[in-house]
Amino acid sequence: MSDIEKINDIITKAEVFYLATVDGDKPKVRPLGFHLLFEDKIYFGVGTHKDVYKQLEANQSAEIAAWDGEHFLRYYGTADLTGNEAVVEKAFELMPEIAEAYKANNWEMGVFFLNDATAEIRNMFAIEESYEFKY
């Protein structure tokens, strides 16, 4: 299993994970459920109409936190918002109810991955494994 696959596996096992962004000078955290490992990058998706996307546009610093029952993950870096239409199509294929809502409301899904990123797999007391990802 590759390093990025290890990180993806923890996020998958967690089911719900958390995305932290910056809003002005304040942190904002919210739960997310969608992620997709595609071309050796983990993509996340949020609506471009949402505050979270606007926060990422203004300040690309972001962090994912997840707990899979065994490991705590901190995965942080710079959100690359260039998008990937193939990822959006796959997201809508995997989540048809979301696709319907987005289509009905004329919304767009913004997908991003973390670049210049660090992933820390931790226990309660220390970092067990650490990985760097630069694309």
Language-model features, listed with the residues they occupy:
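Charged, amphipathic alpha-helical segments
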Residues: 1-5, 46-49, 96-97
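A short, Trp-centered hydrophobic/proline-enriched beta-strand micro-motif
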Residues: 9-23, 62-64
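General beta-strand recognition
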Residues: 18, 42-43, 74, 120
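Short glycine/serine/proline-enriched coil/turn segments at secondary-structure junctions
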Residues: 26, 70-71
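Conserved beta-strand in the GNAT
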Residues: 31-33
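A short mixed-secondary-structure module that forms the rim of ligand-binding clefts
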Residues: 35-70
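Charged, gly/pro-rich active-site loop segments
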Residues: 74-135
